[in-house]
């Protein structure tokens, strides 16, 4: 799996450079974002398709997610590329997205499963206390449904009173959760 991920990352970077020369910024970001989103969805679905997940496997997957998140650097806009984007295809038709150009990557804007994949990496490396914090005090509930978090817990931990307690608390929580599954 690691070799496959590295190959995909190289391919996305090559396509990014090729497309950057011929597409407006918004078209480029949408196209590259689509590729990145496909990788994120594949990683997420591969994890949820498992019957169990040992600590070593979880760490390997989390490390792969870290490698994929390095693609964030593609989505740090520079004012030159965005300003020149309307002239690249010669249309100047105003299809470019107006953006506040900061230093934060815009990856999540163009790859809707990006944050979910990043949270998955965190959950895979977390203990029960960290998962509790991520669900109740952080934004995990914005990216995962209650059932998805329960499934991840059951996938990663042996069934014991602490696991059952956390699952019960999550199921009974009033936390606003996202509506859509991967």
Where are these regions (language model features)?
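Extended alpha-helical "rod" scaffolds
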Residues: 1-182
